[in-house]
Amino acid sequence: SYVRVCFLGEVSLPKHECLLYSHACSSSSCGVSPVIAYSRLWLKRALRAMNSSYSRGMSEAAKDTGAVLIAAFEGWNDACQAATNAVRHLVKRYESREIRHIRCDDFYDYQVARPMLCHVSGRTNLIWPQTTFYDITLDAGKRIYAQIAPEPNYRWKEYCSQSLAIADELDVNRIITLGSMFSDCPHTRPLPIAVSDGDCQCEGDRSYNGPVGIPTVLDVAAAQQGFAHSSMWVSIPQYLGSDECSAGTIRLLDALGKYIGFIFDTADLKQKAEQWKAQASILVRCNDQLHDYVEHLEHDYDLQQKAEAEASLGAPQAEQLVKEAEAFLRQMGN
């Protein structure tokens, strides 16, 4: 169940890769030995894994080297469409073209992810749910790839395998997944954003236990295949419903831009974000109970920000501030 590849020694193959290897051994194409071709694939992955391990000791500035794939998925991982709208904004704002698709039949329940009917120039068309990959040119010296799709209903492992095979073809070095989730946070403050770097096992990454969506599964699969990987999640106020949240989209794009060393143009989103915030403020003013709730969230948010600022300076009172924040959260829970 392994292939011996040059000086790298033994490279273990997952079960589905063993099946692919067996199939390769029984056929050939383009006059190249399938065993050699498959060994090349695993040599490439092994070298990527070695490079990923080496890069962990390098500076943060090194993270913007190599091809990057940005992935976002509709559904459970996409509160108020903040994550998928980030990808849609990049596709619309910058020069982009569709370069790959993943067939939809094996991955979707059409009673959940239904096809859409549309009429164009007098003709009736059905648009089926599918995964689309884009090549996006940001400027003369920088390009990224993007993946957008409804969250699959079935066969997540196979779906991730196909996604990463395409990333392999595109010579992608890093996978960055985007997500948005409803949370107890006020609309009157910058929306909280969490950036998890697969190269750094931070305490926050180990604190969650519970169900996950396809972005997390893709992160794990990417790590297993030697890709560098990161994830970015923005929190959306749960009391405002499911209308599109441009403020959340901007937060993701700002974090992504900082990470890869590029400033994204979000001018057209900022006006929508201001409208979203103004409408939320009107709603809060018209509901006394909601007004009190938001005030509690603001107090909690400000206390946490103060504690983090003090902790970053190494001040002795930081631990006390953290305890106060935890006590306040327990009081809200009761």
Q: Which sequence ranges carry the predicted segments?
A:
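Internal, conserved structured core segments that host functional sites
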Residues: P150-G198, L218
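N-terminal short beta-loop-beta anion/metal-coordinating cradle
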Residues: N51-E151
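Catalytic cores of processing enzymes, dominated by hydrolases/peptidases
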Residues: S183-I263
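Extreme N-terminal basic, low-complexity initiation segments
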Residues: S1-V11
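A conserved C-terminal secondary-structure "cap"
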Residues: L240-N334
